[in-house]
């Protein structure tokens, strides 16, 4: 979910007032085709703007399905820092015969790592929620009514990111 937070909406008028940035942006768009596909141009409110974001619109929509899924990240109190799916299916990584795992661990940690704090392994963590809300506001400001998502996932209720 963290890549969702790397987003900014820049009015084209602002870009034009920054000739060095505009020159680099034009070079980037002309030469970095794979990465440039993540830059969207459109209207933000009443003014032409550019959306600079890590996920493309298609990836954003896929990520939002997980973010807004109550079986995954969305909870009655905020967004979990790790999907609840990992409660029954821990993430396991094998590196040269050594096994590493991350469990969904709400509340007190089952290990002494990081002082026993398990905030980054499941429960709602204020810093992540703050960053996600700010990012979703930016996406919502850029896409407006042109992007609707099901909230919560599976409910059939469609809404904009501004709602």
Task: List each language-model region with its residue ranges.
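Acidic, mature catalytic/reactive cores of soluble proteins
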Residues: 1-163
């Amino acid at each position: 979910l963290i890549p969702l937070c790397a987003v900014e909406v820049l009015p084209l008028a602002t870009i034009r007032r920054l000739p060095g940035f505009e020159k680099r942006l034009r070079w980037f768009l002309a030469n970095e085709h794979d990465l440039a596909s993540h830059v969207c141009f459109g209207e933000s409110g009443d003014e032409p703007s550019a959306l600079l974001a890590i996920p493309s619109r298609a990836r954003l929509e896929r990520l939002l399905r997980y973010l807004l899924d109550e079986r995954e990240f969305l909870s009655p109190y905020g967004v979990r820092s790790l999907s609840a799916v990992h409660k029954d299916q821990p993430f396991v990584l094998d590196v040269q015969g050594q096994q590493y795992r991350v469990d969904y661990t709400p509340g007190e940690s089952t290990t002494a790592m990081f002082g026993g704090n398990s905030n980054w392994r499941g429960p709602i963590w204020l810093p992540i929620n703050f960053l996600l809300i700010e990012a979703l506001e930016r996406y919502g400001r850029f896409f407006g009514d042109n992007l609707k998502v099901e909230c919560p996932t599976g409910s059939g209720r469609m809404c904009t990111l501004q709602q």
